[in-house]
Amino acid sequence: MKVHEHQAKEIFARYGLPVPKGYPAFTVEEAVEAAQQLGKFPVVVKAQIHAGGRGKAGGVKLANNLDEVQKYAAELLGKTLVTFQTGPEGLPVSRIYIEEGTNIDKEFYVAITLDRSKSKLIIMASSEGGMEIEEVAAKNPEAIITEVIDPFLGLRPYQAREIALKLGLPKNLLNKAAGLFVKLYELYMKEDASMVEINPLVLTKEGNIVILDAKVDFDDNALFRHPDIMEMEDPTQESELEVKAKQYNLNYIKLDGNIACMVNGAGLAMATMDTIKLAGGEPANFLDVGGSANAEQIANAFKIILSDPNVKAIFINIFGGILRCDRLAEGIIQASKEVNPHVPIIVRMEGTNVELGKKMLAESGLDLIPADTMWEGAKKAVELASKA
């Protein structure tokens, strides 16, 4: 689960991490009031969306007086902000953050995340802050410093100090920066985060270090332990279909293609999308119905898929284990009768009760296209989608 910048900074402040003073605002009047509470200019007016690249997209403004705060707040609130991370559809700005200005001398990048190749947490840092880390990795990979964090010992103070030293921070701030990194790790562990990022961490002209932008992603599977964080969820930052899918306990992510996928298991779902790409098509979604799906959930999955106007074909690829093929067939038949699909449906299934499942589909009277292999199913889906 993602949270907004102002929410991430609230959490950071609980751990004693240095964040500038600021207030969220949902209306122009609240924005002006927030600026008045800060009591000095300049202030920064920041659009709050779950995506990076806000500055380049015009979502971060420097205001030198109340009139400018009012003007920028009116411009941003209610706007759909398009950045390189949002896709062409953008994300709605329903709130902004009014924050005190900071005299920036130098910018840095710091993050803690899981390195899947090492199966351990790492802390990453770079002296090239303010840029997207992917851009730094592509253009200047040697500028990225990494330290592997021992799962039993945690981030050790000497590691944190070494990172601060390699970043080139002034000697009088090395211990302070090292303490900041250790607190960041503490936050990561205690709040069940999957990623924490500071971009940028700034050295101010007054000689302080301040967190200018904060990002936290939380592990969805651990949210039951954090009701306060669950309350921070903003459904406006997700597509309507993704919100519906959550209500149905389905793992759904909308993509830009025209071939919908319905699969059980995340690994098979990704392999299915890769196969569609290999066959020359573009997947319209990631959809994992899970191993315990029933006929009703299959029907709900169909409804979500068919709500996407871009879908020109549906490829159902199921390996029947816990989710038996006859149960899948029952769900497909029920869903087809309820929603009357207007696009071709290709079905490939293997595993438990596969013959019974195929028999049920064949006798259903529905216009379903069988496939014996994933490759055959992907090719048929691409061919039929191109004709639609």
UniProtKB/Swiss-Prot annotation:
Gene Ontology cellular-component terms listed: cytosol; succinate-CoA ligase complex
Cofactor: Mg(2+)
UniProtKB keywords: ATP-binding, Ligase, Magnesium, Metal-binding, Nucleotide-binding, Tricarboxylic acid cycle
Binding site for Mg(2+): 199, 213
Main enzyme class: ligase
InterPro entries: ATP-grasp, ATP-grasp_succ-CoA_synth-type, ATP_grasp_subdomain_1, Succ-CoA_synthase_bsu_CS, SUCC_ACL_C, Succ_CoA_ligase-like_bsu, Succinyl-CoA_synth-like
GO biological process: succinyl-CoA metabolic process; tricarboxylic acid cycle
UniProt-listed Enzyme Commission number(s): 6.2.1.5
Binding annotation for substrate: 264, 321-323
SUPFAM superfamilies: Glutathione synthetase ATP-binding domain-like (SSF56059), Succinyl-CoA synthetase domains (SSF52210)
Reaction catalyzed: succinate + ATP + CoA = succinyl-CoA + ADP + phosphate; GTP + succinate + CoA = succinyl-CoA + GDP + phosphate
PANTHER family: SUCCINATE--COA LIGASE [GDP-FORMING] SUBUNIT BETA, MITOCHONDRIAL, SUCCINYL-COA SYNTHETASE BETA CHAIN
Subunit structure: Heterotetramer of two alpha and two beta subunits.
Name of the protein described by the UniProt record: Succinate--CoA ligase [ADP-forming] subunit beta
